[in-house]
Amino acid sequence: MYTKIALLGLVGSAAAFNAPMMTVRRDAIATGAAAAVVAPMLRPAGAAMKKDSKAPCVEVFDERDGCKAAGTQKASGDDGFCVKVSMKAIGFNAAEAASVTKNYGIKRFGAKSV
């Protein structure tokens, strides 16, 4: 319902827009260029990237312990699995990163083998 209302409002506003005849194409392009220059400066502070280095971690728990039940199971949706998704801080270990770079010959982003 809300989608239809939003779409109707969008179509109505587009139909109601009528550029004045005295507007010159050059003025319209200059206004658009000025808006493109100013737009990045008007971003809200909340849009900045967080620097806490958290990433989603997915854990899957199996209550069956890897055992299958005797006979055939019907697809009831109760398969004995549980999924946990949480945000965890991801640490940086410089020694491990250097080891991976050295052992796998990775040369990206200026990383050099030690």
From Swiss-Prot:
GO terms for cellular component: chloroplast thylakoid membrane; phycobilisome. (2R,3E)-phycoerythrobilin 2 binds at residues 63, 67, 72, 74-75, 84. (2R,3E)-phycoerythrobilin 3 binds at residue 64. Pfam families: Phycoerythr_ab. It is a peripheral membrane protein. It is found in: Plastid, Chloroplast thylakoid membrane. GO terms for biological process: photosynthesis. Gene3D superfamilies: Phycoerythrin alpha chain. The light-harvesting system in Cryptophytes contains phycobiliprotein complexes. Unusually they are composed of either phycoerythrin (CPE) or phycocyanin (CPC) but never allophycocyanin (APC), with only one type of biliprotein being present in any one species. Unlike cyanobacteria or red algae these proteins are not arranged into higher-order phycobilisome complexes, and they are found in the thylakoid lumen. Belongs to the phycoerythrin family. Heterotetramer of 2 different alpha chains and 2 identical beta chains which form 2 alpha-beta heterodimers within the heterotetramer. The two alpha-beta heterodimers are rotated to an open configuration in contrast to the closed configuration found in other cryptophyte species due to the insertion of a single amino acid, Asp-65, in a conserved region of the alpha chain. In the open form, the central chromophores are not in physical contact but are separated by a water-filled channel. This is Phycoerythrin alpha-1 subunit. It comes from Hemiselmis andersenii.
